[in-house]
Amino acid sequence: MLTLQEKLANLPTTPGVYMMKDENGKVIYVGKAVNLRNRVRQYFQNSDMTPKTRLMVKKIKDFEYIVTDTEVEALILECNLIKEYRPKYNVLLRDDKNYQYIKITNEMFPRLVTTRKVEKDGAKYFGPYVSGYSVKQTIELLKSLFMLRTCKRKFPDQLGKGRPCLNFYIERCLGVCKGDIPEEEYQKLVEKAVKVLSGKGDEIVEELKKKMFEYADNLMFEKAQEIKNKITSLEQIITKQKVIYADDRSEDVINYAEDSSNICIVVLVIRNGKLINKEEFVLKNDEEVFERFLEQYYSDVVSVPKEIILPHEVGNGENIEKMIEKLYGFKAKIVVPKQGEKKQLLEMAKKNAEISLVNKQRIENYYIEALLHLKNLLGIEHDIEKIESYDISNLAGADNVGTLVVFEDGKFNKDLYRKFKLKSFEGQDDIRSVKEVLTRRFTNLEKHGRLPDLILIDGGQNQVNAAVEVLRSLGFNIPVAGMVKDDRHKTRDLIYKGQELNIQRDSLVFKLISTIQEETHRFAVKYHRELRKKHLYESILDEIEGIGEKRKIKLFRIFGSIDNLRKASIEEIVKAADIPYDIALKIKEKIGI
């Protein structure tokens, strides 16, 4: 096996990508180079490096490289490898799974669905949407307007087989599965949905208005009212899209604000003259961070316009333009305006970035101070950067469950949240529950990230003692505190080392602990609701004669919940689930007509 120095001596002088690895073989940095030999050697020969780069170089124990034909190919490969490995020392954009997209699939009778993953599968993607509620609302409006399918049936194999699902009976789907809807007719509706999501909804409104007036002129007032309702729904989407230009130009306007620690980059997404989205990225400020951001952003974005508006020239601008042409098949131009509308939009983006940066700094300062006060209150020597908060609960003595919420680096890290369905005993026993949850968590270290600096238990001294006992038996010396609640289930005090520590209600520590406890409680309640819904559905249907496992699964697949089943008529249950009338009647009698 070659040593590091031998590998450095044998590096080629071609373009390519290099991957730096630590002692565990983990990729900690991915970079690109016009000349691999010169670039990689610089890390080990150059003394003029930033502190961050110097720290990274100390951890490099090995490296690999991939040769490419051109610098642009190296840029594309670098972006892909950064997404795959998410190295510690690279500029990392958001993890896409935290954001939702609306997707219109690329298949026979395309589906309208939400997704957290953008793939190169020929589908049309719109987003990202930060608000899950906004996505759900938009999907529901589009279903009511264009009645596109959301089911997972495979066509043409399942065309004309089986009955339509509930969406057909409540007029949220055309029921293409019946096999009597022409594909061309359906495709026109898909194109209209695409127009709405692309910022061209005004065209659809005008079409609907013409149709509404035609119905009214022919005294078909009910039909006219239906169209009017659709127009109102459509305008709810359109009003969120601010008009920027009188024409239908499309462009991305990108600007940033920075301080010594962070940079906030704002992307104003303008399509067909309307501002349809604003994206914000807060990153650690480092050399060339803006250029690195542009490379990653345009290596895998849902929609690329013909113009990209920037506040100044960037050294890699030409390569970014070439990368876009290679990836997306058309030329995009980077523009740096000196005056006019585009310059004003850059100022708007910068102002938004400045506000976000100030807010982030305010929140960071609050948490830094709160964590420092908490450290002093508990008398802990080390800094508190990661807190794990646990909740134990049960459903009337059954289904004992535990939940874990993680507060890390000043924010909740939902990627590390965990649910535990307790298996080692039956009945209600908080102490055994705490022991099982902590044992499972701390004997499976790889799935939970770094060790916490503090553990919070939603409970009193007994729960704290149980947690400490487990940790000591496993060789861990992690501080554990109990979150004591008042009669209204709100934070009162902390229990630590056998003492109840009084926390002032207006203190930063109280606000921090309350925030963590409320999030822990919210996550536990959400898990309980999922289990309760499952049990309620199973127990009610299990009591009905004529409902076996297959019918139960079918009813759940079609209606989704007892509430939806309760809202459906007997006739709708018969048609949608293809079951006898007398059994549908029994269902309604059991769950309440």
Swiss-Prot record:
Disulfide bonds, paired cysteine numbers: none
All copies of domain UVR, residue ranges: 202-237
One Pfam entry name: UvrC_RNaseH_dom
PANTHER family membership: UVRABC SYSTEM PROTEIN C, UVRC/OXIDOREDUCTASE
Subunit structure: Interacts with UvrB in an incision complex.
GO process terms (BP): nucleotide-excision repair; SOS response
GO cellular component: cytoplasm; excinuclease repair complex
InterPro entries named in the record: GIY-YIG_endonuc (IPR000305), GIY-YIG_endonuc_sf (IPR035901), GIY-YIG_UvrC_Cho (IPR047296), RuvA_2-like (IPR010994), UVR_dom (IPR001943), UVR_dom_sf (IPR036876), UvrABC_protein_C (IPR050066), UvrC (IPR004791)
Location within or outside the cell: Cytoplasm
Keywords, ordered alphabetically: Cytoplasm, DNA damage, DNA excision, DNA repair, Excision nuclease, SOS response
Protein name: UvrABC system protein C
